[in-house]
From Swiss-Prot:
Residues engaged in binding substrate: 75, 81, 88, 102-103, 112
CDD domains in the cross-refs: DHQase_II
Catalytic activity: 3-dehydroquinate = 3-dehydroshikimate + H2O
Taxonomy, superkingdom: Bacteria
Similarity annotation: Belongs to the type-II 3-dehydroquinase family.
Organism: Ruegeria sp. (strain TM1040) (Silicibacter sp.)
Quaternary assembly: Homododecamer.
Protein name per UniProt: 3-dehydroquinate dehydratase
Positions annotated as active site in the UniProt record: 24 (proton acceptor), 101 (proton donor)
Length: 146
């Protein structure tokens, strides 16, 4: 049976490639998705790669993943620092959860230093650009034996 991985992306990540490229790089979210799809195929994973600017939609996808996925990779974006709802939804999931950030949030503004997600995540990757998604997928594959 094929295992499913959810990669969830929060607000403004749909603007990757054009929004603050000096911080987030020139790759688009579609570029990152294509890279992740290729990697997932190699590990035999089915991929649900999703983005929303809306907190409730992200919570709905997390709840869906609870019963259908082997792991979640999430870039909560700005919701990292504000969303107890996303944190609570993730904490109800009994699977590996990886928090990914394109930039090093700890080298940026002070309000970005706190994450509601980090305490319940299996691992946190920040500052590696899109390679953070690759690293999270490789670790997930190792953890679930894919």
């Amino acid at each position: 049976m094929t295992q499913t991985v959810y990669i969830l992306n929060g607000p403004n990540l749909n603007l990757l490639g054009t929004r603050e490229p000096e911080i987030y790089g020139r790759e688009t979210l579609a570029d990152i998705e294509a890279r992740c799809r290729t990697l997932c195929e190699g590990h035999g994973f089915e991929l649900m790669f999703l983005q929303s600017n809306h907190e409730g939609q992200l919570v709905d996808w997390i709840q869906e993943a609870r019963t259908s996925a082997c792991g979640i990779i999430i870039n909560p974006a700005a919701y990292t620092h504000t969303s107890v709802a996303i944190r609570d939804a993730l904490s109800a999931c009994e699977m590996p959860i990886f928090e990914v950030h394109l930039s090093n949030v700890h080298a940026r503004e002070a309000f970005r230093h706190h994450s509601y997600v980090s305490a319940i995540a299996t691992g946190v990757i920040a500052g590696f650009g899109s390679f953070g998604y690759v690293a999270a997928l490789e670790k997930l594959a190792q953890d679930v034996g894919a």
